[in-house]
Structures are given as structure tokens and as C-alpha cells.
A protein has these predicted regions:
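Short acidic/glycine- and proline-prone juxtamembrane loop motifs at membrane-interface regions
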Residues: 211-218, 429
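Transmembrane-helix signature of polytopic, membrane-embedded enzymes
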Residues: 160-164, 180-203, 220-221, 237, ...
Length: 479
């Protein structure tokens, strides 16, 4: 098959011949009531799902991964609290009525879901970004508004804010798992790989954040939807989803990179390329876009526009329009150069190992760290281990997925790896990696080819999730 037309083959092969329009007499005999016709239109999407085995598999696999992983999360979180208590008090992050104060059972159920940054989202959902709330106003703007707005909207229906946040996260996770399955099936042409990718996502070591009052699941659902829409050439939807992702997290801005890459270079299913593949014609020809810019590319401007609207809204309210970006300094992040945190993280991990092996009770080998020397050293080793684990997945993604996926991972990692924190250069890296679904797709493709490794690796990943969740539920910092 001609490679220039191969991208159009899948949708063309799946198309069914259009049914002929019924004759006028038959149309006159249609005696369905308006309510029956409306019901038929509403049930059409469900009928399409039932008619497509790929969609049926996506629904079944994503649902199984969702309920089994979340059951493990709540059982492990509640069990940890029952066994060890709620852990050390963190008054600044544990205000009454926000993450606690719901009675014995309510506090127990909130333990796996409402910790640390959850308080920021819940406070924003209630108070917004009012500039009269003291010194924490700028720090609050690091948390973008869409997720707390969702919490507030659900709370209007009568739900407590913590429950509203959990429901929002679970709904977004369900959509994200379904989208990952569909996207993996499209890119890898394998139901086994799609199923494995879904379970890799649901049982990742930090996947308990997906059902916590955190924005990870919402951002994941929006970014997966953006890629699916871009592959199918729905550029208005790409712009809207990109804007919503940017309104969820500042890293949503980097989604403009893969969106542009898919627009200009493909692969795309909406139309054939305007130029043939470069082949062996050399670098200049290889860099030439395969698709010409058209008016629909303007939809991509919605992605950066969302960040501008957020800044303008803060400024109109009497705040600082650049506060969302200046707030990174308050959180200890500073620009040190592109990907400099990789080298700094290696140094912190090495010194952390020396610290642990020295059995010293003071910061002997890494004085930049704060708090317990043992805890700080262990964290730096753990963070660097996550970085090392991401490397083979990134290499595999570069071999098996379109280039736009790899560009997305590299662009998204440029933010945490270029803005390190002094005591922990790779702080929060596991959460940044958690939402980079191309790594999950790559891992799923590998597990599909090595079925004997599937259960041991997924079991080990689930065990790590339980360990990290136990720390999170008892107010120990994880990521």
C-alpha cells in the first residue's frame, strides 16, 4: 500500500455503505412520536458502541481497571489509617471542614483522597483567588481554576466538597481509561496492548492520585481526548480540549507542541497529506510539513489563550496577572537550565545513598536537603528511580508511536526538569510522569508482547501503589 494513503486506510475500511434514503411513501408512514424519535437519537451512541467490538472492549476493560484499582486504593488507604492512625498533624494542610471534620467514618474514607494539595483545591473551590486572603494568595495561583470550578459546580448540587472532588476525579479517570484504550488500539492495532495500557495506567505506583482531590485525572482525560481528536482532524475540539487542559494545569500549555506536530506532520485520519513522505531525501525535505496550514489551525490558539484569560481574570480582580508563573518561586522552583534537574537529581540520589549508608543523623552528604536526613535521602533516591524507569518507556514510545507523542513527553518533562527545587531537584516528578500517557501506551505494547511478565509487573506496580498510598493517607509527603 502506498504509505501516503495508508493513513486513510483504516477509516475507509471500517466505513459501511450508506443506506439508501427511504421513499417518500415510507417517510409518510413513519408514525413515531416526537418523544420516541428523541429517544432514538439519544440511544444512537449506545447502539454504535454495541456494534463496534473495539468500543465494547474499551468499555469492558476500562471499567474493570477502574473498579478493581479504586477498590484497592480505598481498602488499602482505610486499612492503613485503621492500623496506624492518621499520622502526624499538618495544620496548614489539614484545616477542619476541608480535609477532616466529617466524623469517624467520613474522615476514614477521606484519608486516601484528601491530603496535601487537596486542601488548596478545596479552599480555592470555596474562596477562589481573592487577593485579600493574605500571603498565600500568590501561592494559590499555582493551582489552575478548572478543577476547583468543577468541585464547586458539583457542590452546588448538594455534595460535600471532598466528595465532589472525588466524584469529579473518578468520572475523569473513567473517561481517561476509555480514551487510552481507544488511542492504544488505534496506534498499536492490538487489543492486548490497549488492555495492558489501561491496567498500567490504573495500577501505576502513583495512580492513587487519580481518585484523590487532585487534578491529575481531569488533566489526563483532557490530554488523551486532545490526541484522539487531533488524530481524527477535529481541530475545533482540539482547541477546546487544549484550552480546558491549560485551565487545569500550567503544563497544559505544552499540549500545543504535539497538536502542531500532528497538524503539520501527521499521521492524520481526516485527509491525505499534501506532500509525500520525505523518504531518503535528506534533512531539509524531512523537516518540510506534510500538511499545509489551513484556517482550522487557528483553533489551536485557544490553548495559550486559556492561560492568558486566567491571568487577565486575576488582574481584573485586583491580583497579579503573572502570579500563576511567579508562584513557582514561592514553591521553591527556579530556572536552572534545560533539563539540568536530571544531573542534579543524579547528584542528590548519589549523596542520598551515601547518607543512608553512613547511618548519620545529620545532613552530612547533602546539606541542601531539609527535614529528616533519612527521609530526604530516601525521597531523592525514589525520585531518581522514577526518572530511570521512564527512560526505557520513552525509548519504546519513540519506536512504536508517532513522533508527536514523544515530543509531548519531552516538552512536558522540560518543565520539572528545568525548574528544580533545591532540596529535591526532582520533586513531584512521579506525578508529572503519571499523566504522560504515551509512556503507558509504550509499556502496554511491551506487556502485550511479553504476557508472562504482565502479572508480575502489574502486581509489583500495584504493591508500590499501596506502599505510597499508605504514606499519603497518613500525611507523609510522597510526590
Amino acid at each position: 500500500m502506498n504509505p501516503d494513503t495508508a493513513e486513510m486506510a483504516i477509516p475507509l475500511l471500517r466505513e459501511q455503505p450508506a443506506a439508501e434514503a427511504p421513499p417518500a411513501a415510507a417517510r409518510r408512514r413513519d408514525t413515531k412520536s416526537p418523544s420516541a424519535r428523541a429517544l432514538a437519537r439519544l440511544s444512537a451512541p449506545l447502539a454504535r458502541v454495541r456494534a463496534d467490538p473495539w468500543r465494547i472492549a474499551a468499555v469492558a476493560d476500562s471499567w474493570r481497571a477502574l473498579w478493581s484499582s479504586r477498590l484497592l486504593v480505598w481498602a488499602a488507604g482505610a486499612g492503613t489509617v485503621l492500623a496506624f492512625g492518621f499520622g502526624p498533624a499538618r495544620k496548614a494542610f489539614n484545616p477542619p471542614g476541608v480535609t477532616r471534620g466529617f466524623g469517624a467514618i467520613g474522615n476514614l474514607l477521606a484519608a486516601p483522597a484528601a491530603r496535601w494539595d487537596s486542601a488548596w483545591y478545596l479552599v480555592i473551590a470555596h474562596y477562589g483567588y481573592r487577593p485579600d486572603l493574605g500571603r498565600f494568595t500568590i501561592a494559590r495561583t499555582a493551582f489552575f481554576p478548572l478543577y476547583p470550578l468543577g468541585i464547586r459546580a458539583i457542590s452546588w448540587l448538594g455534595s460535600p466538597p471532598v466528595l465532589a472532588g472525588v466524584l469529579l476525579s473518578l468520572a475523569a479517570l473513567a473517561l481517561a481509561l476509555y480514551g487510552i484504550h481507544r488511542l492504544a488500539a488505534l496506534e498499536l492495532s492490538s487489543l492486548d496492548a490497549a488492555r495492558a495500557a489501561v491496567f498500567v495506567t490504573a495500577f501505576a505506583p502513583m495512580a492513587f492520585f487519580f481518585s484523590a482531590v487532585y487534578s491529575e485525572s481531569l488533566y489526563l482525560a483532557l490530554s488523551v481526548g486532545l490526541f484522539w481528536s487531533a488524530r481524527h482532524g477535529r481541530w475545533a475540539l482540539v482547541g477546546v480540549l487544549g484550552a480546558l487542559a491549560t485551565a487545569t494545569r500550567s503544563t497544559g500549555l505544552v499540549l500545543l507542541v504535539p497538536a502542531l506536530a500532528l497538524y503539520l506532520y501527521g499521521p492524520r485520519l481526516d485527509r491525505p497529506p499534501d506532500r509525500p513522505r520525505a523518504g531518503a531525501a535528506g534533512p531539509p525535505r524531512a523537516m518540510a510539513p506534510r500538511y499545509r496550514l489551513r484556517a482550522d489551525a487557528l483553533w489551536l490558539a485557544l490553548v495559550p489563550a486559556a492561560a492568558a484569560v486566567f491571568g487577565a481574570w486575576l488582574a481584573l480582580g485586583g491580583g497579579d496577572g503573572l502570579a500563576p508563573f511567579r508562584s513557582q518561586q514561592i514553591w521553591g522552583r527556579h530556572f536552572a537550565g534545560p533539563y539540568v534537574a536530571v544531573w542534579q537529581g543524579l547528584g542528590a540520589a548519589f549523596e542520598g545513598a551515601r547518607q543512608l549508608l553512613s547511618f548519620q543523623h545529620a545532613h552530612v552528604y547533602y546539606p541542601a536537603a531539609t527535614g529528616s536526613p533519612t527521609v530526604a535521602a530516601s525521597h531523592n533516591l525514589m525520585l531518581f528511580a522514577f526518572l530511570l524507569a521512564a527512560i526505557p518507556a520513552l525509548v519504546l514510545a519513540a519506536r512504536r508511536l508517532p513522533r508527536a507523542y514523544v515530543l509531548y513527553v519531552l516538552a512536558a518533562l522540560a518543565l520539572p526538569l528545568s525548574y528544580p527545587v533545591a532540596g529535591q531537584p526532582l520533586m513531584s516528578l512521579p506525578r508529572f510522569l503519571l499523566v504522560l500517557f504515551p509512556l503507558h501506551l509504550a509499556a502496554g505494547s511491551w506487556l502485550a508482547e511479553h504476557p508472562r511478565a504482565r502479572r508480575p509487573l502489574l502486581g509489583a506496580s500495584a504493591a508500590l501503589m499501596v506502599v505510597f498510598l499508605a504514606q499519603f493517607a497518613t500525611w507523609h509527603w510522597v510526590a
